[in-house]
Amino acid sequence: LLAAEAFGIALDRVMFSEPATAMIADGGSTVALRGTLMGGQAILSAANKIKQRMADAVRETLKAQSIDDIAWQNGNVFNRHNPELSLSFQQVCDMTRATGANLSAYGWHVAPNIHWDEEKGCGSPYFTWVYGCQLADVAVDMRTGKITVNNVVATHDVGKVINPVGFSGQVYGGVLQGMIGYGMLEDFNTEHGVVKSENFDTYLLPTIKDMPHIDIIAVENYDKAGPMGAKVIGEPVLELGAAALNNAVSFAIDRPNRTLPLTLEQVRLGYNLKKPERQSEQMLESGDKKQVHRLNTLSLSVPQTLKEALTLMAEKGAMPIAGGTDVLVQARMLSGEVPLVNIAGLAELKEIFDVEGGVSIGSGVCFTDLVKHPLIQQRYPPLATACKTVGSLQLRNRATIGGNIVNAAPCADSMPPLIIYDAEVELRSARGTRRMPVSEFVVGGYRTLLEPDELVVRFILPAPTQQPLINRYLQLGRRNALNITRQSLTGQFMVDKGVVRLCRLVDGALMAKPQRLTEVEQALTGKTLDAATIDYAAGVLHDKVEKAIGGRWSAPYKVPVFIDMFRQMLQEVMTEQKK
């Protein structure tokens, strides 16, 4: 870009061989962008040598007294005082070459002298400085500790902005990494000097969905030490974000904070919680106690029919694979051979159709197709809402509802709505077919009643009641995409003249498995929905949750936050039924 600007030619006419950053001397206040400051000056040095040779060759033709009288713009070289005297850049190159002048040159840049006394801690260690200021506008949910960044203003003095798109990109990336990543998500876990964060299921990086709106302001103070007056932009953006976020959150919650990242727990409790060492979220491990980076132990069978798939599943050790979003991750934890049966192409597992007013959902239906299906949207809105929160668009295009239930993670997003609708699961093997409620099929975290030779073929949801229901689904997660649900609450209510006639509640990512909160339902059913009833039901819920998970490492956060989510849901229902 600097060479193109110097010669006044289009960028596509410049060929650039990018060196390793380490080959370029440190540029001072930024390191990774030293190429702009140090390398840029060297490029201009070489370009000016060549331009002088060109000027000597065409000076008489352009009637120029010196190189200062010559302009280089838009692929032309002309007399700046008499623009009609003009040559194309190619003509200038040809005329210069005809004189025998060399059209190549080395450029050099020697940084100005600096002084730094390490012993006294004084001096000026850099020959140029960048300045910046960032402001964060945030909203904090005091019930959950969830931070929403509404807007960011990033003002940076970078000298002359050479590449506006590149400058903006550096600011966007720096704010996302510094403010959202370092400031909110990247919880690096060490114990006794040993790193426990082994993978990206615990060390969370921000996604594009977490990018806030950013107003970018470039302050262009010309700097004589930089190429064309430019400074640099890079690390300085990163360094401001977390501090701006922390100050904003501290003002919002009226409490100073001196610990990063500002996790949900840190904001809500005032201290962070560390999960005990474990191998992965899937709770799978091999004797090697590690994850492998390459899967070279897989063998894949591709049946053409469901009958053929069931025959293959009868073989010892066979595992089905559809979307692969869980199975492939789990396979990295295993050191032995993993024989897979690919059921992704079986059409009979991808059907959604009406069953006596209810619906049948094939186990191979991906979440994208499930969410957009009109039968699901019209009859079972909480299921559609919950499944929209699964992973990311790419994952929803692959992940299947069958895999989500068979994996049986406590945080499985599709499970609570299926339970609240009394859904049944149909299992099939070469031996026969059986059905059972989803609530009974999952017996605990990552544990089901599925036999080794069985496949989940479909889920059957009964016809929904024709009476008007108030449906609610509340979900809490750390990120806006690629998110593992921290906890959720699914609710169905029928309220008549202020009295709760029907109530169904299912937790998510709270206890060992999602389940109906029957004691709480009983505390609400038949009662007038008012503040006193909510307080009483919240007390019943607190006792149940405390008994179930009170001894866990996460209980100091999960218990009060879940109670607050419950109160929020009932307040919303009470408000809606009054309309």
Regions found by a protein language model. Give the residues of each.
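Residue-level marker for well-ordered alpha-helical positions
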Residues: L1, Q52, A243-A244, K307, ...
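C-terminal catalytic domains of large/alpha subunits in multi-subunit enzymes
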Residues: L2-Q291, A532
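C-terminal structural segment of proteins
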Residues: A252, N257, R268-K579
